[in-house]
């Protein structure tokens, strides 16, 4: 039977007839697949015109939800409704006999029936993967030619439909290794907005989700499939509207994803073909274990491919892999044979410095490196807030990023620093995972990381890519040198850097005078001082980072106080490591409302 093009009027009549039917059934899987191919062929001309139009409209700055989602579905929003609606099926031609056959058949070809190109030998370049022309063109426009090890070993089995548990150090190219197979699968199955979501990527932080979204935007520049992002802090109603219209590739943070799965009626995810869990160890560390279990339980498991990536393999990651992956997954570890746990182009050092000299050294270092791109890590939001206010006040401009900021502020700061050629970003560990910030020269760990894994992820913000170069510097107090043994056990090579005393600018007296006279800086300094002690008291390596060994007079001088201010640190001292994790604080942020502790009395 020849394939004919439908006019919009004819298609509208068929659509009305389909919506007006009373319980008409779907096609069998064979007929559905056959009809889908016919429909795709018949609409080839229309799709081509749409793609040209979308190409013209492509914007440079990624928004929280790409405009393309609404452009692709503007003429057919009524076809994607609730999850069990008939209207979410592909628009295939049906006669009355076929309609009455079955109501439980899939609407898209299964992955088992799909034959994606495979390569027998391990490829070296993207052109050897037999990817679609659209994907190859996008990769070339992104400037990539040769694959990294995780891409060489991960992409072929993923394109063949295998479940994969991948372990690779930060900066190894994991994002493309799971996005390329996902995009190719959506393209091969000819996903359309009315089919709903075919791939979900779960990310631990909003910034990492935005970054993955940006890569997906570039990779799908020549594809007609839709993509979007749902994250905490964004407009939930706007997200729900876009999901109802149809988002084929969805990037999400766990809490917001679970919210939409449970409460957004028009969110069609029954056609899900692939689930990607990125930075799984961090997702579980910050208290999303229950959410991830619920997400995996809600999502359809039959005919679903799962890709789980984690820089470190923990017991919790193994448990998540057990419930989410199909039996017999492929395990890829590209780091186990490496001599060091950090990338080769990274020069790593530490400096031993007393508490009262730490800020002076940081100030001197930043002053001497104004032309460099630097990230400075702190242990708490209040420490970031205080140092940002102080440095900007004394004309040393910095950007700040932490979990207490509103999402729009965080997003703007992230992209501003990404686009900057030089400058300083001071932040909590919210920026320590997965973020690909271009051309970072120095990573400064002003406050100590919680463990060697956090150290590795912090320094992973520099020396990224195959031939990336960068430097890192960690501040240690004399009582903290025991941390070096933990780094050595984790295969992290560090050497001691020395800074001559004559090169350190002594601004201590001016600092104390400023903090004493400026009410707002004084209050901010006191909050930072308190939060620093709280974070130190709740450190996981208490044998090394013992709050009782701190010289509080010297610590106070580092915050601009001649004598230690009176602060209550009972919250930090009483907060166990497990409680800190399960509270889901945003990488250093303090709870909005501190718990009330019952005062002990003699009657107790």
Swiss-Prot record:
GO cellular component, one term: nucleolus
Acidic residues biased stretches: 73-86
Enzyme Commission number(s): 3.6.4.13
UniProt-recorded name of the protein: ATP-dependent RNA helicase HAS1
Keywords: ATP-binding, Helicase, Hydrolase, Nucleotide-binding, Nucleus, Ribosome biogenesis, RNA-binding, rRNA processing
Keyword Nucleus: yes
Composition bias type Basic and acidic residues, residue spans: 60-70
Compositionally biased residues, Basic residues: 11-20, 593-604
GO MF terms, alphabetically ordered: ATP binding; ATP hydrolysis activity; RNA binding; RNA helicase activity
Domain free text: The Q motif is unique to and characteristic of the DEAD box family of RNA helicases and controls ATP binding and hydrolysis.
Species whose genome carries this gene: Coccidioides immitis (strain RS)
Motif range (Q motif): 124-152
Compartments reported by the entry: Nucleus, Nucleolus
């Amino acid at each position: 039977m020849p394939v004919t093009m439908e006019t919009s009027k004819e298609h509208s009549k068929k659509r009305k007839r389909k919506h007006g039917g009373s319980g008409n059934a779907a096609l069998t899987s064979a007929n559905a697949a056959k009809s889908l191919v016919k429909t795709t062929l018949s609409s080839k001309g229309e799709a081509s015109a749409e793609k040209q139009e979308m190409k013209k409209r492509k914007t440079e700055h990624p928004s929280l939800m790409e405009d393309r989602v609404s452009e692709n579905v503007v003429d057919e929003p009524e076809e994607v409704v609730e999850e069990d609606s008939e209207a979410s099926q592909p628009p295939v031609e049906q006669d009355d006999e076929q309609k009455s056959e079955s109501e439980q058949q899939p609407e898209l070809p299964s992955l088992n029936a799909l034959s994606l190109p495979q390569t027998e030998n391990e490829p070296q370049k993207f052109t050897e993967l037999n990817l679609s022309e659209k994907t190859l063109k996008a990769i070339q426009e992104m400037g990539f030619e040769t694959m990294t090890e995780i891409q060489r070993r991960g992409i072929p089995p993923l394109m063949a439909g295998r479940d994969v548990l991948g372990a690779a150090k930060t900066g190894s190219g994991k994002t493309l290794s799971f996005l390329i197979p996902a995009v190719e699968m959506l393209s091969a199955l000819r996903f359309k907005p009315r089919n709903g979501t075919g791939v979900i990527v779960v990310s631990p932080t909003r910034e990492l989700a935005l970054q993955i979204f940006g890569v997906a935007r570039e990779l799908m520049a020549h594809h007609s499939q839709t993509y979007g992002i749902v994250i905490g802090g964004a407009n939930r109603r706007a997200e729900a509207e876009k999901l109802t219209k149809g988002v084929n590739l969805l990037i999400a943070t766990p809490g917001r994803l679970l919210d939409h799965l449970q409460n957004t009626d028009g969110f069609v995810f029954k056609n899900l073909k692939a689930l990607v869990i990125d930075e799984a160890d961090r997702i579980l560390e910050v208290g999303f274990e229950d959410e991830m279990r619920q997400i995996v339980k809600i999502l359809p498991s039959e005919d679903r491919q799962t890709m789980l990536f984690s820089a470190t393999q923990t017991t919790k990651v193994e448990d998540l892999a057990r419930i989410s992956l199909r039996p017999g997954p492929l395990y890829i570890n590209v780091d186990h044979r490496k001599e060091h746990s950090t990338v080769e182009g990274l020069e790593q050092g530490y400096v031993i410095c007393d508490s009262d000299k730490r800020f002076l050294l940081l100030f001197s270092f930043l002053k001497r490196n104004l032309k460099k791109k630097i990230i400075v890590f702190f242990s708490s939001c209040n420490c970031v807030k205080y140092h940002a206010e102080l440095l900007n006040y004394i004309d040393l401009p910095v950007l700040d990023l932490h979990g207490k900021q509103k999402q729009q502020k965080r997003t703007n700061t992230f992209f501003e620093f990404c686009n900057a050629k030089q400058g300083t970003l001071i932040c909590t560990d919210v920026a320590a995972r997965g973020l690909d910030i271009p051309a970072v020269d120095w990573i400064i760990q002003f406050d100590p990381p919680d463990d060697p894994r956090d150290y590795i992820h912090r320094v992973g913000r520099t020396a990224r890519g195959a031939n990336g170069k960068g430097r890192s510097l960690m501040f240690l107090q004399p009582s903290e040198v025991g941390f070096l043994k933990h780094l050595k056990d984790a295969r992290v090579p560090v050497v001691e850097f020395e800074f001559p005393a004559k090169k350190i600018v002594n601004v201590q007296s001016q600092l104390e005078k400023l903090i004493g006279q400026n009410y707002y800086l004084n209050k901010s300094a006191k909050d930072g001082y308190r939060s620093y002690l709280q974070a130190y008291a709740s450190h996981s390596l208490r044998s090394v980072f013992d709050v009782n060994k701190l010289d509080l007079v010297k610590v106070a001088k580092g915050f601009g106080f001649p004598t230690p201010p009176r602060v209550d640190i009972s919250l930090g001292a009483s907060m166990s490591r497990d409680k800190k994790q399960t509270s889901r604080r945003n990488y250093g942020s303090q709870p909005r409302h501190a718990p009330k502790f019952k005062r002990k009395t003699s009657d107790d």
